[in-house]
Amino acid sequence: MDLVYGLVWLLTVLLEGISGQGVYAPPTVRIVHSGLACNIEEERYSERVYTIREGETLELTCLVTGHPRPQIRWTKTAGSASDRFQDSSVFNETLRITNIQRHQGGRYYCKAENGLGSPAIKSIRVDVYYLDDPVVTVHQSIGEAKEQFYYERTVFLRCVANSNPPVRYSWRRGQEVLLQGSDKGVEIYEPFFTQGETKILKLKNLRPQDYANYSCIASVRNVCNIPDKMVSFRLSNKTASPSIKLLVDDPIVVNPGEAITLVCVTTGGEPTPSLTWVRSFGTLPEKIVLNGGTLTIPAITSDDAGTYSCIANNNVGNPAKKSTNIIVRALKKGRFWITPDPYHKDDNIQIGREVKISCQVEAVPSEELTFSWFKNGRPLRSSERMVITQTDPDVSPGTTNLDIIDLKFTDFGTYTCVASLKGGGISDISIDVNISSSTVPPNLTVPQEKSPLVTREGDTIELQCQVTGKPKPIILWSRADKEVAMPDGTMQMESYDGTLRIVNVSREMSGMYRCQTSQYNGFNVKPREALVQLIVQYPPAVEPAFLEIRQGQDRSVTMSCRVLRAYPIRVLTYEWRLGNKLLRTGQFDSQEYTEYPLKSLSNENYGVYNCSIINEAGAGRCSFLVTGKAYAPEFYYDTYNPVWQNRHRVYSYSLQWTQMNPDAVDRIVAYRLGIRQAGQQRWWEQEIKINGNIQKGELITYNLTELIKPEAYEVRLTPLTKFGEGDSTIRVIKYTGEFHCGFEDGNICLFTQDDTDNFDWTKQSTATRNTKYTPNTGPSADRSGSKEGFYMYIETSRPRLEGEKARLLSPVFSIAPKNPYGPTNSAYCFSFFYHMYGQHIGVLNVYLRLKGQTTIENPLWSSSGNKGQRWNEAHVNIYPITSFQLIFEGIRGPGIEGDIAIDDVSIAEGECAKQDLPTKNSVDGAVGILVHIWLFPVIILISILSPRR
């Protein structure tokens, strides 16, 4: 019978890799973390939460399955905001954040997708724990008026510390611990509105013994090994809130370039207040010099102006604040305009009519601004015909007007207005305005051949509007056909000569542009306008810009190049070329595309085909790479236990892959396999012959042997067809000599339930277990002590009956085939933790099943009875001669208090340490070496057939 099973297993091995179908699979994902979470000893989480101390290193790994290999992306959300790691997602399996800060806590998502099905997404919440230094503030009601809330002499000490998790506060007076009710003169309470953020110590009607040293201790109960923090405050009869005085004027008006010093002194407060300077808007200038309460600004500028405040704080009462405003003198933006007689509908200046000249500047401070008027260099005073006024600052600040009533010929000349500040130190601004018979309003025209303007994309162009008149005003340019910004980003651009220069013209800049006169430095009349049309020509935009076409020989291919947009749209011509060889030319009629067919591909037809579509502005190009190269192989990363631990210093690796789109090109006849040790330069290569056609999704297997432990290797795989080499794929294989399962992931490390038993094992954690669980049995945490960690257990409550079995099957573990007549089989140390607590504990058995023996199970380990409320560890040496499987069998005892649990199952190469093994081969011991002679011929045959596909 054993021989029959052996032959069946051998047939299965021979078929593996030859007919492997269906390995394409959508992604699955799970998140694991390095290190132990520092958990709170409270069962308050029903979701995946990882806790870490601020300043430590967070390392999360996204473990994925699926074929082809899924692409991974990490993202993070916190509340409604999304944080993508400084606007760049993390695209590898491991997310590592060194020196993590509190704002980096939140929910982290791992997204895996490979184009099959929906993306797989898992998340984990990261809680960053921290405790800041506590701060004590004091508020007192001593001497308050009777209408206030508190009538007695009362002091409130408030302690606040930022923390996560919530902080617990305690108070001491000297060495005495203060508790609510321990002293009638002391009350300790939390305000309703603070939600545990603070704890207030109220000293009612101060007594002599209340003048003492008070200490506030903030604690998070040593979570994440965060120590308690303490702050002290001495309360005395001199304790008082701060008061200060500024030894400067308000406001302070200074000239640019001067140095200014602000002095702030304390006039009261116990303990001694600390002094800080702030600015009402923005930060303090970098050049300032601070010395206690003295602030010095050397070489002040207009940017340094503003309100500066001195704040005194000693945590008693409210901080004291005094402010002063610094004003830096400035004169800028001098301009003028001429207004003709408003009572006549005429924009010209005429003898006998009124004319007004206006000057405007921006002045700081505005109250120091003065204007002086001159005619031909001589001072001008206000008179009946020459009226000098200043406009209301609320209407037009910094503006002066000269009204010339009944203009005469003798009034022609140059008028000058001079703006100055009374405080001096600032250069005056002079504005000259000429009034004469040649002073006429402006006129705008567009020179011939300057509209429409035709240019090409990327060129530099100048738009011109010719302005006449005296004086010539500023010209404003804007878009006339749409509300979009000008090239400099503003809605209007100024020009003093009427020219608008645009560098690197783009097609979006085509359209109508408006030039118009400004009222400044000219006549205050209705603006003159003109329009200039800009036409930007650009070469055709085509698709596809590049397309790779893979086809085998003797097959047909048709390439198509389509025009998306172009200007001018007619006349368009096209050229098809293979390299430098001209294949076809033509002209577009009504169609928007051109095609080039290849009826039967041959070696000389492969190459890069270029289709150029041409207009006056240039050419757009479609490129087609026609090739017979095979697509890259797709390495299969989900091979379970691909490492064979065969001999002491070397190992073998089961390399598996599928071929992407195998039917796209000619049949793949072989693969070139390259392998090199990580960090080395030289590749060792060999060919793997392929017989027959490869099917889509077919899993191909090749065994790499004689790999040196524990080195990693780079493996390169290149498909070969009659065309030649295809695309290569490279991956790294690593030696992993140990299997470990803590049952934390969703698929419980590929353990499965036995269909032949009476009931199933259950994945459980203390935090998620049913609130109606049976007391006095089962673990209170997983093996590591975490209430959020998972384990597997059997629930023995009703309707379970005595003697019923639950069986849990491990995945199949592979070992390397070897000569059975050689040295002793490789040894493995099998270990696990078990929990057997309760007065009705039954039996826990472990069996070893070798591949091919579907009915024979060899007892490996057994234990029964109550072992106490603790996790115990078992170690067993096993010596399998072929692939094997482990079976955990839990048998229900006589009552409901009989829950059995297992956790942290490990299989490591080599024998267990002697101190870990049981002292005798009892019921709790290990079974001896397992050898099955009937498998020897099968193993030899497998060795001969390897490597295989």
From Swiss-Prot:
A lipid is attached at residue 924 (GPI-anchor amidated aspartate). Its main location: membrane. Residues 638-738 form the Fibronectin type-III domain. One of its GO terms (cellular component) is glutamatergic synapse. Residues 739-914 form the MAM domain. InterPro entries: Cell_Adh-Cytoskel_Orgn, ConA-like_dom_sf, FN3_dom, FN3_sf, Ig-like_dom, Ig-like_dom_sf, Ig-like_fold, Ig_I-set. Residues 925-949 form a propeptide. Pfam families: I-set, Ig_3, MAM. It is found in: Cell membrane. Residues 27-127, 134-232, 242-328, 340-436, 442-533, 540-627 form the Ig-like domain. Disulfide bonds join 62-110, 159-216, 264-310, 359-417, 465-515, 561-611. Glycans are attached at residues 92, 213, 237, 434, 443, 504, 610, 703. Residues 1-25 form the signal peptide. Keywords: Cell membrane, Disulfide bond, Glycoprotein, GPI-anchor, Immunoglobulin domain, Lipoprotein, Membrane, Repeat, Signal. It is a lipid-anchor; GPI-anchor. GO terms for biological process: gene expression; motor behavior; negative regulation of neuron apoptotic process; neuromuscular process; neuron migration; pattern specification process; regulation of presynapse assembly; regulation of synaptic membrane adhesion. May be involved in cell-cell interactions. Interacts (through the Ig-like domains) with NLGN2. This is MAM domain-containing glycosylphosphatidylinositol anchor protein 2. The gene is Mdga2.
